[in-house]
Amino acid sequence: MTQSSIGRIWFCQIQRLLALIVLIGLSQGLSQPAFARGGAAQVDAELVFAVDISYSMDQAEQVLQRNGYAEALVSEQFLQALKGGLYGKIAITYLQWASYRDQDVILPWTLIDGPESAAAAAAKLRRAPYRRAQRTSVSGAIDSAMYLFENNGYDGLRRIIDVSGDGPNNDGRPVEAARDAAVAAGVTINGLPLVGIRPYLGYADIAELDLYYQDCVIGGDGAFMIAIHDRKAFVDATRTKLVQEIAAPRIRPQPSDILPAQALSPKTNCMIGELMWNRRWRN
């Protein structure tokens, strides 16, 4: 046997060995349990409830928001949608926000996998104390929510930020910049703007907050908003939103599949809140 023949035999054997290694690796990868990102538990969605507590939100509106989320979590419609998910569970956290420096979490990341865990989370929300704070930074809320996703112990098919509030951004960086950064990372931002709940407009309020949320706040794969015009509608709107989010397609969107901003050019001045604030205080 010549030296060249021996070389060809060794080359073929090495090829077979490499192919076997690849097949073993693929089979092991396919048989891994439902954990990812360093052991994070897989869920259908990771949701941040980002709720406005600025002074434009009076006590009644704050109670309305909080109870809306609590009641939606224990509703039959939500629990049925939860069971229909690929994993039958989601992870939630509740973030309160005002200025870009003022955010706090009153419900840390919590696994919701059925009626008992949903009821326990709802009870914690209802027990948490209320507070109010200065300014309205929607961008700060989005940025803080993005931080909360990191190393939270969960790996959701979707990551969603639910922004609820009654006014435009007037503090922190421009809201479009925060939204676009979140969308570019594959996160969906949905909205629950409170529009015309009070019979008057304050100096930091705008009449068409729903259009502002549509053009400047929400974004990402399947993003939507539900404008709330009546206090009595908050529970129904929150429940509808949660059901729609859980029932959404269960494949995590890739950043390359998502437009970094709204598909159409904004019709609303997304700096309106900052302009109104500066005009009010002449700075």
Predicted regions located by residue number:
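Bacterial N-terminal signal peptides that target proteins for export
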Residues: 2-19
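Bacterial N-terminal signal peptides
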Residues: 16-29
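Von Willebrand factor
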Residues: 41-108, 117-164, 191-201, 208, ...
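DG-centered beta-turn motif at the end of beta-strands
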Residues: 52-53, 145, 157-171, 178, ...
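VWA/integrin I-like adhesion module and closely mimicked acidic/polar interface patches used
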Residues: 82, 167-215
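Short beta-strand-loop
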Residues: 85-124, 201-215
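Von Willebrand factor A/integrin I-like adhesion domains
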Residues: 194-252
